[in-house]
Protein backbone atom coordinates (compact mmCIF):
# COMPACT_ATOMS: atom_id res chain seq x y z
CA UNK A 1 0.00 0.00 0.00
CA UNK A 2 1.16 3.51 -0.80
CA UNK A 3 1.85 5.80 2.14
CA UNK A 4 -0.47 8.80 2.36
CA UNK A 5 1.58 11.94 1.93
CA UNK A 6 0.83 15.57 2.72
CA UNK A 7 4.26 16.92 1.86
CA UNK A 8 4.45 16.82 -1.93
CA UNK A 9 6.74 19.35 -3.59
CA UNK A 10 5.83 21.00 -6.86
CA UNK A 11 8.89 19.48 -8.50
CA UNK A 12 7.81 15.96 -7.50
CA UNK A 13 4.36 16.51 -8.98
CA UNK A 14 5.77 17.93 -12.19
CA UNK A 15 7.98 14.85 -12.53
CA UNK A 16 4.85 12.67 -12.36
CA UNK A 17 3.19 14.76 -15.07
CA UNK A 18 6.27 14.38 -17.28
CA UNK A 19 6.33 10.56 -17.17
CA UNK A 20 5.67 8.71 -20.43
CA UNK A 21 1.90 8.29 -20.74
CA UNK A 22 1.91 4.49 -20.49
CA UNK A 23 4.26 4.49 -17.49
CA UNK A 24 2.10 7.05 -15.69
CA UNK A 25 -1.10 5.08 -16.30
CA UNK A 26 0.55 1.83 -15.24
CA UNK A 27 1.64 3.36 -11.94
CA UNK A 28 -1.75 4.99 -11.33
CA UNK A 29 -3.68 1.81 -12.14
CA UNK A 30 -1.50 -0.28 -9.86
CA UNK A 31 -2.22 2.10 -6.97
CA UNK A 32 -5.90 2.19 -7.89
CA UNK A 33 -6.15 -1.61 -7.68
CA UNK A 34 -4.45 -1.61 -4.28
CA UNK A 35 -7.17 0.59 -2.82
CA UNK A 36 -10.36 0.03 -4.83
CA UNK A 37 -12.20 -2.48 -6.95
CA UNK A 38 -11.16 -1.21 -10.41
CA UNK A 39 -14.45 -2.34 -11.95
CA UNK A 40 -16.74 -0.55 -9.52
CA UNK A 41 -18.06 3.01 -9.86
CA UNK A 42 -19.80 5.09 -7.21
CA UNK A 43 -22.72 7.13 -8.56
CA UNK A 44 -23.85 10.47 -7.18
CA UNK A 45 -26.65 12.82 -8.21
CA UNK A 46 -26.46 16.62 -8.17
CA UNK A 47 -29.36 19.05 -7.87
CA UNK A 48 -29.18 22.82 -8.24
CA UNK A 49 -31.37 23.98 -5.34
CA UNK A 50 -30.83 27.69 -6.02
CA UNK A 51 -29.93 28.98 -9.47
CA UNK A 52 -28.23 32.16 -10.67
CA UNK A 53 -27.63 35.68 -9.32
CA UNK A 54 -24.36 34.69 -7.65
CA UNK A 55 -22.30 37.78 -6.73
CA UNK A 56 -19.00 36.06 -7.51
CA UNK A 57 -17.27 36.70 -10.86
CA UNK A 58 -15.94 33.22 -11.72
CA UNK A 59 -14.96 33.63 -15.37
CA UNK A 60 -16.35 30.22 -16.35
CA UNK A 61 -19.72 30.27 -14.61
CA UNK A 62 -23.17 30.78 -16.09
CA UNK A 63 -24.60 31.56 -12.65
CA UNK A 64 -22.56 34.71 -12.04
CA UNK A 65 -24.61 37.92 -11.91
CA UNK A 66 -21.70 39.68 -13.60
CA UNK A 67 -22.34 38.12 -17.02
CA UNK A 68 -25.25 37.93 -19.45
CA UNK A 69 -25.61 34.23 -20.08
CA UNK A 70 -29.38 34.09 -20.47
CA UNK A 71 -29.77 32.11 -17.26
CA UNK A 72 -32.92 32.91 -15.33
CA UNK A 73 -32.60 33.44 -11.59
CA UNK A 74 -34.51 30.95 -9.45
CA UNK A 75 -35.11 31.12 -5.72
CA UNK A 76 -34.26 28.35 -3.27
CA UNK A 77 -36.30 25.25 -4.06
CA UNK A 78 -39.06 24.06 -1.77
CA UNK A 79 -38.06 21.21 0.52
CA UNK A 80 -40.72 18.79 -0.74
CA UNK A 81 -39.53 19.18 -4.32
CA UNK A 82 -35.91 18.58 -3.31
CA UNK A 83 -36.86 15.39 -1.48
CA UNK A 84 -38.86 14.23 -4.49
CA UNK A 85 -35.80 14.72 -6.68
CA UNK A 86 -33.67 12.83 -4.16
CA UNK A 87 -36.06 9.88 -4.24
CA UNK A 88 -35.94 9.82 -8.04
CA UNK A 89 -32.14 9.86 -7.91
CA UNK A 90 -32.13 6.98 -5.45
CA UNK A 91 -34.49 5.00 -7.66
CA UNK A 92 -32.01 5.12 -10.54
CA UNK A 93 -29.11 3.99 -8.38
CA UNK A 94 -27.54 7.12 -6.88
CA UNK A 95 -26.11 6.53 -3.40
CA UNK A 96 -25.18 10.14 -2.70
CA UNK A 97 -27.35 13.22 -3.22
CA UNK A 98 -25.56 16.52 -3.70
CA UNK A 99 -27.28 19.89 -3.44
CA UNK A 100 -25.75 23.06 -4.86
CA UNK A 101 -26.72 26.69 -4.30
CA UNK A 102 -25.34 29.71 -6.17
CA UNK A 103 -24.30 31.72 -3.14
CA UNK A 104 -21.11 33.44 -2.05
CA UNK A 105 -22.01 32.18 1.42
CA UNK A 106 -25.30 31.04 2.99
CA UNK A 107 -27.32 33.23 5.33
CA UNK A 108 -28.52 31.72 8.59
CA UNK A 109 -32.09 31.69 7.24
CA UNK A 110 -31.08 29.89 4.06
CA UNK A 111 -28.90 27.45 5.97
CA UNK A 112 -31.84 26.49 8.18
CA UNK A 113 -33.82 25.46 5.08
CA UNK A 114 -30.90 23.49 3.66
CA UNK A 115 -30.57 21.64 6.96
CA UNK A 116 -34.15 20.41 6.59
CA UNK A 117 -33.27 19.15 3.11
CA UNK A 118 -30.21 17.34 4.45
CA UNK A 119 -32.21 15.68 7.21
CA UNK A 120 -34.91 14.63 4.77
CA UNK A 121 -32.43 13.03 2.37
CA UNK A 122 -30.68 11.27 5.25
CA UNK A 123 -33.93 9.55 6.22
CA UNK A 124 -33.88 7.88 2.78
CA UNK A 125 -30.57 6.22 3.58
CA UNK A 126 -28.56 8.28 1.11
CA UNK A 127 -25.32 10.14 1.72
CA UNK A 128 -25.66 13.91 1.63
CA UNK A 129 -23.40 16.53 0.13
CA UNK A 130 -23.91 20.28 -0.25
CA UNK A 131 -22.02 23.08 -1.92
CA UNK A 132 -23.12 26.45 -0.60
CA UNK A 133 -20.06 28.68 -0.97
CA UNK A 134 -17.88 29.89 1.86
CA UNK A 135 -18.68 28.81 5.42
CA UNK A 136 -17.87 30.14 8.85
CA UNK A 137 -16.61 27.68 11.43
CA UNK A 138 -19.94 27.92 13.27
CA UNK A 139 -21.89 27.09 10.10
CA UNK A 140 -19.70 24.06 9.50
CA UNK A 141 -20.43 22.76 12.99
CA UNK A 142 -24.17 23.34 12.43
CA UNK A 143 -24.06 21.31 9.21
CA UNK A 144 -22.21 18.51 10.97
CA UNK A 145 -24.80 18.42 13.72
CA UNK A 146 -27.51 18.21 11.05
CA UNK A 147 -25.90 15.02 9.75
CA UNK A 148 -24.17 16.29 6.62
CA UNK A 149 -21.73 13.74 5.19
CA UNK A 150 -19.82 15.74 2.58
CA UNK A 151 -19.16 19.39 1.80
CA UNK A 152 -18.05 20.28 -1.72
CA UNK A 153 -15.76 23.27 -2.11
CA UNK A 154 -13.57 23.10 -5.19
CA UNK A 155 -10.31 25.01 -5.32
CA UNK A 156 -10.82 25.25 -9.11
CA UNK A 157 -7.19 25.81 -10.16
CA UNK A 158 -3.75 26.66 -8.81
CA UNK A 159 -3.05 29.38 -6.27
CA UNK A 160 -0.85 31.08 -8.86
CA UNK A 161 -3.55 31.13 -11.58
CA UNK A 162 -6.51 31.81 -9.30
CA UNK A 163 -6.72 35.60 -9.74
CA UNK A 164 -6.96 35.08 -13.51
CA UNK A 165 -10.16 33.10 -12.96
CA UNK A 166 -11.87 34.79 -9.99
CA UNK A 167 -11.35 38.23 -8.43
CA UNK A 168 -14.19 38.43 -5.89
CA UNK A 169 -12.46 35.95 -3.59
CA UNK A 170 -8.96 34.56 -3.25
CA UNK A 171 -7.40 31.13 -3.02
CA UNK A 172 -6.92 31.38 0.73
CA UNK A 173 -10.69 31.92 1.13
CA UNK A 174 -11.19 28.45 -0.34
CA UNK A 175 -8.63 26.90 1.97
CA UNK A 176 -10.19 28.62 4.99
CA UNK A 177 -13.58 27.05 4.28
CA UNK A 178 -11.99 23.63 3.74
CA UNK A 179 -10.25 23.99 7.09
CA UNK A 180 -13.57 24.82 8.78
CA UNK A 181 -15.16 21.76 7.16
CA UNK A 182 -12.32 19.51 8.31
CA UNK A 183 -12.46 20.99 11.82
CA UNK A 184 -16.13 19.98 11.94
CA UNK A 185 -15.25 16.41 10.85
CA UNK A 186 -17.30 16.67 7.69
CA UNK A 187 -15.94 14.71 4.73
CA UNK A 188 -14.32 17.02 2.18
CA UNK A 189 -15.16 16.95 -1.52
CA UNK A 190 -12.76 19.23 -3.37
CA UNK A 191 -11.26 19.22 -6.83
CA UNK A 192 -10.91 21.49 -9.79
CA UNK A 193 -11.66 22.45 -13.37
CA UNK A 194 -9.50 21.73 -16.37
CA UNK A 195 -9.77 24.15 -19.28
CA UNK A 196 -9.35 27.48 -17.47
CA UNK A 197 -6.39 28.47 -19.66
CA UNK A 198 -4.12 26.91 -17.06
CA UNK A 199 -0.67 25.43 -17.65
CA UNK A 200 0.48 21.93 -16.72
CA UNK A 201 2.36 23.54 -13.83
CA UNK A 202 -0.95 25.02 -12.66
CA UNK A 203 -2.50 21.55 -12.68
CA UNK A 204 0.45 20.22 -10.71
CA UNK A 205 0.14 23.05 -8.20
CA UNK A 206 -3.61 22.47 -7.82
CA UNK A 207 -3.08 18.77 -7.05
CA UNK A 208 -0.30 19.65 -4.64
CA UNK A 209 -2.66 21.98 -2.74
CA UNK A 210 -5.31 19.26 -2.51
CA UNK A 211 -2.95 16.50 -1.43
CA UNK A 212 -1.21 18.72 1.11
CA UNK A 213 -4.40 19.52 3.00
CA UNK A 214 -4.40 18.27 6.60
CA UNK A 215 -6.11 15.14 5.35
CA UNK A 216 -6.72 14.25 1.72
CA UNK A 217 -10.17 15.10 0.35
CA UNK A 218 -12.46 12.09 0.55
CA UNK A 219 -13.76 12.91 -2.93
CA UNK A 220 -11.85 14.72 -5.66
CA UNK A 221 -14.08 15.83 -8.55
CA UNK A 222 -12.60 16.88 -11.88
CA UNK A 223 -14.56 19.03 -14.29
CA UNK A 224 -13.76 19.55 -17.96
CA UNK A 225 -14.80 23.13 -18.67
CA UNK A 226 -18.02 23.49 -20.62
CA UNK A 227 -17.60 26.97 -22.17
CA UNK A 228 -20.66 29.15 -21.54
CA UNK A 229 -21.52 31.90 -24.06
CA UNK A 230 -21.46 35.28 -22.34
CA UNK A 231 -18.69 34.38 -19.88
CA UNK A 232 -15.08 35.56 -20.25
CA UNK A 233 -13.96 31.97 -20.84
CA UNK A 234 -16.44 31.16 -23.60
CA UNK A 235 -13.68 30.77 -26.20
CA UNK A 236 -10.98 29.13 -24.09
CA UNK A 237 -9.12 26.26 -25.75
CA UNK A 238 -9.84 22.98 -23.91
CA UNK A 239 -7.10 20.63 -22.69
CA UNK A 240 -6.31 17.62 -24.83
CA UNK A 241 -7.72 14.24 -23.88
CA UNK A 242 -4.30 12.99 -22.81
CA UNK A 243 -3.79 16.07 -20.61
CA UNK A 244 -7.06 15.38 -18.82
CA UNK A 245 -6.27 11.68 -18.35
CA UNK A 246 -2.79 12.56 -17.07
CA UNK A 247 -4.34 14.76 -14.40
CA UNK A 248 -6.62 11.93 -13.27
CA UNK A 249 -3.64 9.57 -13.08
CA UNK A 250 -1.46 11.96 -11.09
CA UNK A 251 -4.34 12.64 -8.71
CA UNK A 252 -4.76 8.89 -8.12
CA UNK A 253 -1.05 8.50 -7.36
CA UNK A 254 -0.98 11.45 -4.97
CA UNK A 255 -4.29 10.70 -3.24
CA UNK A 256 -4.51 6.89 -3.39
CA UNK A 257 -7.50 6.46 -1.09
CA UNK A 258 -9.64 9.35 -2.35
CA UNK A 259 -12.61 8.78 -4.61
CA UNK A 260 -11.85 10.51 -7.93
CA UNK A 261 -14.97 11.73 -9.71
CA UNK A 262 -15.60 12.67 -13.33
CA UNK A 263 -17.95 15.63 -13.05
CA UNK A 264 -19.00 18.27 -15.59
CA UNK A 265 -17.91 17.92 -19.18
CA UNK A 266 -18.49 14.20 -19.71
CA UNK A 267 -20.69 15.01 -22.72
CA UNK A 268 -17.45 16.07 -24.40
CA UNK A 269 -15.69 12.81 -23.52
CA UNK A 270 -16.01 9.81 -25.77
CA UNK A 271 -16.14 6.22 -24.56
CA UNK A 272 -12.39 5.68 -24.98
CA UNK A 273 -11.50 8.81 -23.00
CA UNK A 274 -13.81 7.87 -20.13
CA UNK A 275 -12.45 4.33 -20.16
CA UNK A 276 -8.90 5.69 -19.88
CA UNK A 277 -9.99 7.90 -16.98
CA UNK A 278 -11.45 4.88 -15.18
CA UNK A 279 -8.24 2.93 -15.83
CA UNK A 280 -6.18 5.87 -14.51
CA UNK A 281 -8.13 5.92 -11.25
CA UNK A 282 -11.47 7.69 -11.66
CA UNK A 283 -14.14 5.71 -9.82
CA UNK A 284 -17.18 7.94 -9.52
CA UNK A 285 -19.53 9.89 -11.79
CA UNK A 286 -22.66 11.98 -11.54
CA UNK A 287 -25.89 10.47 -12.87
CA UNK A 288 -28.56 12.67 -14.40
CA UNK A 289 -29.00 14.73 -17.54
CA UNK A 290 -28.11 18.05 -15.88
CA UNK A 291 -25.20 19.12 -13.65
CA UNK A 292 -26.13 22.50 -12.21
CA UNK A 293 -26.55 24.37 -15.53
CA UNK A 294 -24.59 22.10 -17.91
CA UNK A 295 -25.64 18.99 -19.78
CA UNK A 296 -24.66 15.50 -18.63
CA UNK A 297 -24.96 12.12 -20.40
CA UNK A 298 -28.36 10.50 -20.00
CA UNK A 299 -28.71 7.60 -17.62
CA UNK A 300 -29.24 4.92 -20.27
CA UNK A 301 -26.09 6.08 -22.04
CA UNK A 302 -24.09 5.65 -18.82
CA UNK A 303 -25.62 2.25 -18.13
CA UNK A 304 -24.71 1.12 -21.63
CA UNK A 305 -21.17 2.43 -21.14
CA UNK A 306 -20.83 0.52 -17.87
CA UNK A 307 -22.08 -2.66 -19.55
CA UNK A 308 -19.62 -2.37 -22.42
CA UNK A 309 -16.71 -1.76 -20.04
CA UNK A 310 -17.75 -4.43 -17.52
CA UNK A 311 -18.16 -1.84 -14.77
CA UNK A 312 -20.42 -2.41 -11.78
CA UNK A 313 -22.34 0.35 -10.08
CA UNK A 314 -21.66 0.61 -6.35
CA UNK A 315 -24.86 -0.33 -4.53
CA UNK A 316 -24.06 0.97 -1.04
CA UNK A 317 -22.79 4.24 0.32
CA UNK A 318 -19.14 5.08 0.03
CA UNK A 319 -18.09 6.14 3.51
CA UNK A 320 -16.50 2.81 4.38
CA UNK A 321 -14.20 3.03 1.36
CA UNK A 322 -12.52 6.34 2.06
UniProtKB/Swiss-Prot annotation:
Pathway connected to this protein: Cofactor biosynthesis; biotin biosynthesis; biotin from 7,8-diaminononanoate: step 2/2
Keywords from the UniProt entry: 2Fe-2S, 4Fe-4S, Biotin biosynthesis, Iron, Iron-sulfur, Metal-binding, S-adenosyl-L-methionine, Transferase
Assembly: Homodimer.
Protein name as annotated: Biotin synthase
Cofactor: [4Fe-4S] cluster; [2Fe-2S] cluster
General function of this protein: Catalyzes the conversion of dethiobiotin (DTB) to biotin by the insertion of a sulfur atom into dethiobiotin via a radical-based mechanism.
Residues annotated as binding [2Fe-2S] cluster: 98, 129, 189, 261
UniProt EC number: 2.8.1.6
GO molecular-function term, one example from the UniProt record: biotin synthase activity
Protein encoded by which gene: bioB
Residues where [4Fe-4S] cluster binds: 54, 58, 61
Cofactor details (free text): Binds 1 [4Fe-4S] cluster. The cluster is coordinated with 3 cysteines and an exchangeable S-adenosyl-L-methionine. Binds 1 [2Fe-2S] cluster. The cluster is coordinated with 3 cysteines and 1 arginine.
